[in-house]
Amino acid sequence: MWHRACGLAKRADAAQGRGMHGFRRHVLACNNARLPGRRLTFRIGGDVVGYVTAELARALTFWPQHIHFDGGGLSIRGGRHAAALQGIAQDLSERGYFRWRDEAFDVRAHPGGPVLARIDRGALPAFGILAEGVHLNGLVRRAEGVHLWVGRRAPHKTLDPDKLDHIVAGGVPAGLTPVETLAKEGDEEAGLPAELAVRAEKVGEIGYAMEREEGLRRDLLHCFDLWLPEDFTPHPNDHEVVAFELWPLARVHDAVRDTDMFKFNVNLVLIDLFIRQGLIVGTEAEWLRQALNAE
């Protein structure tokens, strides 16, 4: 997955110079990272779990009892040493390296692999550690065509405030599966009843490696479709979303193609939806399908 992302990073550099528009710009923007690039590999035991900047690596020299440096980067042994990672992250947060989110995430070398440690969500981009999330396409069949529920992110959100979002989306916290996370987030974000949430169908995975202001985001998105009854109306429960609107899917298609109204990674999940719904076809669909493939 990350080798593919590095290849797309080269295209992203070229696209930036040309001022590329349309759907491809979203895919390339989310795959602008070159790995390891100027970063150092971060390992737990013998497994590469992340990539850190030279600045963060210097800060980590304050924990020689846990962190070891060699020609290949830096590493932390498993067991009690890996368990110390959460405390190290908290100290770094207090020193201003990143914002503490008070939500633990599992640390894995690859999706589906064993949990090697846990670390606060706020530290993930700083360490370049893989994060997993869920995104739900809340779809409605109406006489005039397919519609999609669209949420607007709250203005106080640190990440992409006021942008448009899915009806349900969120990170997979430590100890939960994507399906369990979907049910949890569905209730919290949209008042989605459990009896509806269980009908969601997983339709794929999308991975990317992206350099952003907060650091290196290596994300794997678990994508779901849920066909909702016409009489269901989502309502915000946790102040993360301020309102929901039901849009014709064609309107969503045009907004993604022509604007930056949606949160950066939501665009990728929607592009996949447009392909599956036949709104993007031909060579463009094939290019996008291959670029989005997380395998």
Residue ranges and their predicted role:
Residues 1-163, 170-187, 192-235, 241, ...:
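N-terminal leader/linker segments that precede catalytic domains of diphosphate-processing enzymes
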Residues 246:
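Short aromatic/basic micro-patch
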